[in-house]
C-alpha cells in the first residue's frame, strides 16, 4: 500500500477565519481596531514580518504578503516622528496589499493612521501579548494551517500512548480491530478516513479524524457505531502522533513471513519514515493482542533500547560461544 503520497497544502486562509479561529485554540486574544471586510483579505504564508525597514522607507524587498507585526520598536518609531512625516511613512506602508496588521503589547496607533488602514481595506488588530509570544503563537497556528496533509484509508488508534495506524485492503477487519482495541480501554483517533499532517520540516506526523465522519465507525453486519456515545469520552482522541504502521495482509502460504523481528521495516508517509509491522491474517488469530504487543515493543525500544529478538539472539550467541570455549579447553 503506497502511503507516501505527495501531500496537499492549503493555498491560503481568510483573515476572517484567522481572527475567529486562533483565539479558540491558543492563549491569545485579539481586538479589532477598525471595520473592514476581513473575507477579502487572505493570508498566503506561515511566516510573519516586522516592517521596520519598510517604515524607514526601504521597500524593495518588503514581504508585504505576510501578516505584519508592529511591536514596541515600530510603534515608538512612528510616534517619535512629526505628524506630517508619520502620515507619509504610514501611507507608504498601507499602499501595499498586506493581509492585516497586528499591534502587540497593547500598543496604539493614532486614529488618522487607523483611518488610512481602513481606507486601504487592511484589518488592524491589537493584543496585550508581547511581540515574542504573539509571533510564537501566530507562527504555530499558521504552521498548522499550511502544513502538508493527506487523507488515508485506515484506522488510527492510541494504544498504551502509542499512535498506531492500521492499514490494509478493504474487508480485512481494520474497523473491527479498532473497535476491539477501544473496548479494551484504548482510544480511537479516526476510522475509515485518517487525515495525517506534517508541520513544516518536522519529522512528526499527526493524525486527526475527518470532521464529517467524526468518531463514528461502520462495522459490517452491524452498521454505524458512535464510539463516543457507546464508550464515553475516554475512548476518543482528537489528535495523535503516527508512531507505528501496522499493515494487515491476507494470509498467503507461499510467502515467508518475518518470524524473529530482526528485519526492521519502515513505511514512508509524507516523506517521513515510520516503523512498519506486517501482520498476516487468518481465522482465529488474535490481532488485537498482537497490536497491543506491537505498541509495548515500541515503548521498550524507545525508552529502554530493548528489542526482544536482539536479546534472544545475544543469549543464543553467548551459549554457543560458551560451549565452544569449553570444547576448546578440553582439547
UniProtKB/Swiss-Prot annotation:
Start and end residues of each stretch annotated as Important for the catalytic mechanism of both phosphorylation and dephosphorylation: 217-226
Enzyme Commission number: 2.7.11.-, 2.7.4.-
Catalytic reaction annotation: [HPr protein]-L-serine + ATP = [HPr protein]-O-phospho-L-serine + ADP + H(+); [HPr protein]-O-phospho-L-serine + phosphate + H(+) = [HPr protein]-L-serine + diphosphate
Annotated region described as Important for the catalytic mechanism of dephosphorylation, given as residue ranges: 280-285
Gene Ontology biological process terms, A to Z: regulation of carbohydrate metabolic process
Disulfide-bond pairs as recorded: none
Keyword list, A-Z: ATP-binding, Kinase, Magnesium, Metal-binding, Multifunctional enzyme, Nucleotide-binding, Serine/threonine-protein kinase, Transferase
Enzyme class at the top of the EC tree: transferase
Binding site for Mg(2+): 175, 218
Binding-site positions, ATP: 168-175
Active site positions, chain numbering: 153, 174, 192, 259
A molecular function GO annotation: magnesium ion binding
Record flagged with keyword Kinase: yes
Cofactor(s) annotated in UniProt: Mg(2+)
More details: Both phosphorylation and phosphorolysis are carried out by the same active site and suggest a common mechanism for both reactions.
HAMAP family associated with the record: HPr_kinase (MF_01249)
Subunit-level organization: Homohexamer.
Protein role: Catalyzes the ATP- as well as the pyrophosphate-dependent phosphorylation of a specific serine residue in HPr, a phosphocarrier protein of the phosphoenolpyruvate-dependent sugar phosphotransferase system (PTS). HprK/P also catalyzes the pyrophosphate-producing, inorganic phosphate-dependent dephosphorylation (phosphorolysis) of seryl-phosphorylated HPr (P-Ser-HPr).
Family as reported in the entry's similarity comment: Belongs to the HPrK/P family.
Free-text note on domains in this protein's UniProt record: The Walker A ATP-binding motif also binds Pi and PPi.
Protein name: HPr kinase/phosphorylase
Gene: hprK
